[in-house]
Amino acid sequence: MPRLIKKVGSLRRGKRGVPKGVIHIQASFNNTIVTVTDVRGQAVSWSSAGACGSRGTKKSTPFAAQTAAENAIRMLIDQGGMEQAEIIMKGPGPGRDTASRAIRKSGVVLSFVRDITPMPHNGCRPPKKRRV
């Protein structure tokens, strides 16, 4: 007799506790985006400086990045929390250090912090300098 395979329901919109995960911080000169994923790369929660209410040039401030990181961690705690995490930072923006500082203060144990900012090995020509 064939064995019945249990159907696993979708976890979308449901609460799921993630014991270990990855916190991605993408800091550009215009905005800071914080995404929390599990170890497989499935997004659990996210936030950005623009989604937290900052508009225009205020999105690129360190305070807006701190607010985005706190908001992403708060959403994560509401879903069940996370004990251990890794931080992966990308981009040269002004909010990268402030966002990682806010994550450290939240109580999540960090295993390591990695910087994956893309650096050209003399690749494409950069845009011309602004003359204001």
Swiss-Prot record:
It is found in: Plastid, Chloroplast. Transmembrane segments: none annotated. GO terms for biological process: translation. Keywords: Chloroplast, Plastid, Ribonucleoprotein, Ribosomal protein, RNA-binding, rRNA-binding. InterPro entries: Ribosomal_uS11, Ribosomal_uS11_bac-type, Ribosomal_uS11_sf. Signal peptide: none annotated. Its main location: plastid. GO terms for cellular component: chloroplast; ribonucleoprotein complex; ribosome. One of its GO terms (molecular function) is rRNA binding. NCBIfam families: PRK05309.1, uS11_bact. Part of the 30S ribosomal subunit. Belongs to the universal ribosomal protein uS11 family. This is Small ribosomal subunit protein uS11c.
